[in-house]
Each structure stands twice: as structure tokens, then as C-alpha cells.
């Protein structure tokens, strides 16, 4: 991500100023929590996609910074709510909001972040940015609910899996790129190209996340967390659709009833590896990455395009 950060270093600093301003509150408790959130910032991938998408079309302006802030506010709100739903005590190596301030406050904090983002756009009449991101909220909610609905019977098709990750992950990255582009591009076709570009990157990003569960390099061994949570992701879906009926029955039984037993989870991970699930998912991930790059190459060569290409490659090459 070095090139990406380098070409928009001053813009990223400006974004951080805007973001800190956006989350301020006169309520002492809320302001303290907001400061905690600002301090434990992540990789800022989504704001970077907003800023670079805008730079591809022209000069970054105040509307661009507001779009980047809205995207980050929305993303942070979903993470806070996710931690409550998943009962996660940690996020990015820090205690989660619900771990420190309990569930009720965490839910309200997520609501606050979302409302601040929407008001930021509304008060500045950034109606197109607001429309783009509101669509993302709808798709993300539908994606999460579809996953809950379909995961109950552990019989997920590839098509439904892609529909789920398109909604819960890719839609936000698609909206980030479209929102950024909408602040500088005048041609709606270019904005749509950037939306599609972001969607493809988001699909590749989620498949990479799903692969970590089966082949996590950073901790030396696969975690199997998705299996423990009864989540069917692409590597396992591929194996279930291509293995013998008896093995399929055995794997489904383990995921349903023995998902806390380390040796059983290890058996499932081994089957996914041996039967080509990891290889298949990796190919799909690179296919989405290549589709994203094809869309990006519609724009003339420039340092900004190079930076976006680097970010795309980072999403599939990262080790955490």
C-alpha cells in the first residue's frame, strides 16, 4: 500500500481531520468512546478507495472528504454492531466497544455513527453520495440476513454465497468507489465503472478473508473460526458440492454438532485442502481481482491508476 499512501498522503491527513471532527460529541461518554475509536483506526482501505477514485476523475474537494468520512462512519458502525452480534471481545487487537462499555452502549454508539454519517451528507446537500451509501446500507443488511437465513440448513449454493458476500462486503467497497468518483467525474458511465470496480475488489477481498480461515499464515495454522460459527464459505462449499455423499454427510454433521472439537475441525480443514477447496477459492479470488483491473484499465495510465492497482493487489496478497 506504499504507493497508494504516498500519492494521497496529504489528502489522508486531511481526511483524518474531517473524520475526527465528524465524530465529536457534546456528550462526555460518547466523546470518550469516539476518541477511543479514532485512536484504534484500521488500515483505512475504504477511505483510500474513496480518495483515489475521486483523484482519478479530478481534484479532491470538500465533498470528497465528506464522502470518505461517511464511508468510514458507516463501516465503523457496522463493525461495532457486528461485535455485539458475534459477542466479540476484541477488534484489531484492542478491546471492542461492547467489551468495554457493554452491549446497550455499543448498539447506541453504532446508531450514533450511522446518524452522524447520514447527517454529514444531508446537511451539506451531498444527495448523490447519500443515495449511493444508503443503497450500501440496504444491501449490507440484506446480505447479513440472507447469510443467517441460508446458514441454518447448511446447504449453501455457490450462487447464494456470492449473493451474500456481494451484499455484506462488496457493496460497501463498490459504494466507496462510486461515492468518491461522483465528487469529481461528470460522466455517469465513469462513476458506474468505478462502482463495478469496487464491487469486484470487494468480492476478492471477502474470498481472501474466507481463505484465512483455512490457511492463515500469520499465526502458523488455520483457525477454523467459520466452521466453529457454522458459516459456510467458498472453500467448504466447493468441497461439499464435489465430494462423495457420505463425506458430505460427515462434514455437515461435524459443522452442526462437533464444531468445538479441535480434531474434528482439523479434519474438515484437511478435507477442504486435499479436495481442492482452497485452490478453487483462490482461483475465484484472482478472477474477481483481474475483472477489477480490467475495469480500472479503461482509464488512462497515471500514478493514481497505479496506486489503485496496488491497492487491488494488496487485497488479494495481504497476510492478515
For each feature predicted by the language model, list its residue ranges:
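All-alpha prenyltransferase/terpene-synthase fold signal
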Residues: 1-320
Amino acid at each position: 500500500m506504499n504507493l497508494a499512501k504516498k500519492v494521497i498522503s496529504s489528502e489522508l491527513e486531511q481526511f483524518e481531520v474531517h473524520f475526527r471532527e465528524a465524530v465529536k460529541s457534546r456528550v462526555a461518554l460518547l466523546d470518550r468512546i469516539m476518541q477511543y475509536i479514532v485512536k484504534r483506526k484500521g488500515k483505512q482501505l475504504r477511505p483510500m478507495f474513496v480518495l483515489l477514485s475521486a483523484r482519478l476523475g479530478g481534484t479532491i474537494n470538500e465533498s470528497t472528504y465528506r464522502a470518505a468520512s461517511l464511508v468510514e462512519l458507516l463501516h465503523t458502525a457496522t463493525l461495532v454492531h457486528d461485535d455485539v452480534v458475534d459477542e466479540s471481545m476484541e477488534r484489531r487487537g484492542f478491546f471492542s466497544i461492547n467489551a468495554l462499555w457493554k452491549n446497550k452502549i455499543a448498539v447506541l454508539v453504532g446508531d450514533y455513527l450511522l446518524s452522524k454519517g447520514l447527517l454529514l451528507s444531508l446537511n451539506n446537500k451531498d444527495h448523490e453520495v447519500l443515495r449511493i451509501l444508503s443503497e450500501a446500507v440496504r444491501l449490507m443488511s440484506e446480505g447479513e440476513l440472507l447469510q443467517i437465513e441460508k446458514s441454518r440448513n447448511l446447504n449453501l449454493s455457490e450462487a447464494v454465497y456470492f449473493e451474500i458476500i456481494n451484499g455484506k462486503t462488496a457493496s460497501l467497497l463498490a459504494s466507496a468507489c462510486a461515492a468518491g468518483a461522483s465528487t469529481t467525474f461528470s460522466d455517469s458511465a465513469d462513476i458506474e465503472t468505478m462502482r463495478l470496480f469496487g464491487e469486484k475488489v470487494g468480492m476478492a477481498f471477502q474470498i481472501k478473508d474466507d481463505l484465512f480461515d483455512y490457511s492463515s499464515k500469520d499465526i502458523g495454522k488455520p483457525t477454523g473460526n467459520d466452521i466453529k460459527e457454522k458459516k459456510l464459505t467458498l472453500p467448504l462449499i466447493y468441497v461439499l458440492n464435489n465430494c462423495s455423499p457420505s463425506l458430505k454427510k460427515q462434514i455437515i454433521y461435524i459443522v452442526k454438532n462437533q464444531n468445538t472439537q479441535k480434531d474434528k475441525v482439523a479434519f474438515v480443514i484437511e478435507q477442504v485442502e486435499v479436495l481442492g477447496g482452497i485452490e478453487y477459492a483462490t482461483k475465484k479470488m484472482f478472477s474477481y481481482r483481474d475483472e477489477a483491473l480490467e475495469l480500472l484499465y479503461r482509464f488512462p495510465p497515471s500514478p493514481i491508476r497505479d496506486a489503485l492497482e496496488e491497492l487491488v493487489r494488496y487485497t488479494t496478497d495481504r497476510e492478515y
